[in-house]
Regions:
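Hydrophobic alpha-helical segments within soluble ligand-binding/sensing domains
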Residues: 69, 127-161, 209-213, 264-268, ...
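Periplasmic-binding protein-like
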Residues: 28-29, 81-88, 107-111, 166, ...
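Gram-negative bacterial Sec-dependent N-terminal signal peptides
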Residues: 1-22
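Extracytoplasmic "Venus flytrap"
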Residues: 25-45, 49, 53, 57-75, ...
């Protein structure tokens, strides 16, 4: 081939490739920590939807450290991403991130951890995808109520009260607060007095939950514990490990304490199948991930954010609420 023709052909090809790349959307995502089971499911959904939409998605593990996440966001902004999808380590530290994105004209989609309303309102290109935590709390409490009504012997001392342990997410996390409050309310609304034998923050972590539960067992005696409510499945599974060490929740109906969690993760569904976990609540990671990536794409393109465009109901032009679903022994196989 003539060198001049080759050079022109190569130049044309490079220009075409550069143009094609320039037309792609680059989205930067930060997840508060990669080893959170639910957020692993969310980011897997995000990656699948990004591939389907032709988005170049770069994800960073913030390792549960807000300063690290701040640096990651700075790097993404310097890199010139078209949109950010953020799962903040500390939702109360979201304002500076929004300010930086706003100054650069970059849309921000928060997912799973909701910043304060004034932060979301501070920039017209900020959105939130999540679920209403009070729903999951209500459904968790209802499962305990249903169990006690169907199994009168669950009230070990026959005093008509549910004597329970509560394992919570991190201190100050909105979902932890609401799941706790509304699960307690649901038990009272179900006609029971409730007695909290112990409550502590296990920070969404299975190992911490096992340690906390062992402490409660030593403090109050396993024979007095009638129910265990956990703000997520990892903590529920951690609590079950502590129960199993005492010979409970291993198949003997006389040694069973109802435990409920939230998220409907694969390990939780497996625990439901073996009978060690009473129930959980589906925190729909798949649809949360899909909605987040669609919002990122539409906002980066300057498109109108409508229900039809996103494929989900958009509240106040900013919020996508993905409903929770109660997962019981009667329907858990539908979610496996």
């Amino acid at each position: 081939m003539n060198k001049k023709v080759f050079a022109m052909t190569l130049g044309t090809a490079l220009l075409a490739a550069t143009t094609a790349f320039a037309g792609d959307l680059l989205v930067g995502g930060c997840i508060y920590k990669f080893d959170d089971t639910h957020m692993t499911n969310v980011r897997n959904s995000m990656k699948a939807e990004a591939d389907a939409l032709g988005i170049d998605l770069e994800l960073q593990d913030s390792q549960n450290r807000q300063p690290l996440q701040n640096d990651q966001v700075d790097t993404f902004i310097t890199k010139g991403v078209n949109a950010l999808v953020l799962n903040p380590v500390d939702r109360t530290a979201s304002a500076p991130l929004v300010d930086k994105a706003k100054a650069a004209g970059i849309p921000v989609v928060f997912i799973n951890r909701e910043p304060e309303a004034d932060v979301i309102a501070s920039y017209d290109k900020v959105f939130y995808v999540g679920a209403r935590a009070e729903e999951s709390g209500t459904q968790s409490g209802e499962m305990i109520v249903d169990y006690f009504k169907a199994n009168p012997g669950a009230d070990k001392n026959g005093n008509g009260k549910i004597e329970y342990i509560m394992l919570k997410g991190e201190q100050g996390h909105q979902d932890a607060t609401l799941r706790t409050e509304y699960s307690q309310k649901a038990m009272r609304d179900g006609g029971f007095e409730i007695v909290e034998l112990g409550s502590d923050n296990a920070n969404w972590d299975k190992v911490q939950a096992t340690d906390k539960m062992k402490g409660f067992i030593s403090a109050v005696g396993i024979e007095h514990i009638e129910a265990i409510l956990c703000n997520n499945d990892d903590m529920a599974l951690g609590a079950i490990e502590a129960l199993k060490a005492e010979g409970y929740n291993t198949g003997d109906p006389a040694k069973f304490i109802p435990v409920v969690g939230v998220d409907a993760t694969a390990p939780a569904l497996a625990a439901m199948a073996d009978g060690s976990l009473l129930g959980t609540v589906l925190n729909d990671a798949k649809n949360q991930g899909i909605a987040a990536m669609r919002l990122a794409k539409l906002s980066a393109e300057g498109a109108e954010i409508t229900n039809d465009a996103v494929g989900y109901e958009v509240t106040d032009g900013k919020y996508v609420w993905v409903p929770y679903v109660k997962v019981t022994q009667a329907n858990y196989k539908d979610f496996q």
